[in-house]
């Protein structure tokens, strides 16, 4: 998921602390931020609805028959774009999924929120673990699922938070709810190689 360091020391950061409303939603939401430490490479899940948030772009939002945003764009080499909202319903409907580190967010069906994009696998600790998935979009007829630590979207409810220590996006709200969930906090893995 990205590394940095000198002389045998490598730092891997997976994600970062997410701010509220990360992931696809049916209303505007907040941003998942990339670490501002220049020595750290980050890979996040879904960002804010309709914004270029963190590494993964947020899902497109929809409310009361009007497309309120366009999908956010992912950061090259770190995350992917968010998915589009549904276009067939004349009422508040499904939000697109947040982009994950490994794939774009899914596009929403009629009134059902879309799934977030998948994350990326890292085996730096010796066991492969997939992290930094996108959060699911909210919907009025069903919720989208967050993948690889991403929070589920809300079914006429607020979204669920991303899993801690994954850097994955939170789920977006559905229906007339406007509170998405925070992304999972990031982790830093240090690996040292002793020189003979």
Place the predicted regions along the sequence by residue.
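Low-complexity, glycine/proline-biased repetitive segments and flexible coils/loops
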Residues: 1-196
């Amino acid at each position: 998921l990205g590394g940095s360091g000198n002389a045998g020391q490598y730092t891997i950061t997976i994600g970062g602390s997410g701010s509220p409303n990360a992931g696809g939603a049916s209303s505007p939401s907040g941003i998942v931020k990339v670490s501002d430490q220049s020595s750290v490479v980050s890979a996040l899940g879904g960002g804010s609805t309709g914004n270029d948030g963190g590494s993964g772009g947020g899902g497109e939002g929809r409310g009361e028959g009007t497309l309120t945003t366009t999908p956010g764009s992912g950061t090259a080499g770190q995350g992917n774009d968010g998915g589009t909202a549904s276009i067939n319903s004349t009422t508040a409907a499904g939000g697109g999924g947040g982009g994950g580190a490994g794939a774009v967010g899914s596009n929403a069906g009629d009134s059902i929120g879309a799934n977030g994009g998948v994350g990326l696998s890292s085996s730096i600790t010796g066991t492969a673990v997939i992290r930094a998935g996108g959060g699911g979009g909210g919907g009025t007829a069903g919720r989208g699922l967050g993948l690889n630590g991403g929070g589920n979207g809300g079914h006429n409810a607020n979204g669920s938070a991303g899993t801690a220590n994954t850097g994955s996006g939170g789920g977006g709200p559905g229906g007339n709810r406007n509170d998405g969930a925070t992304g999972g906090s990031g982790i830093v893995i240090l690996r040292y190689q002793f020189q003979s």
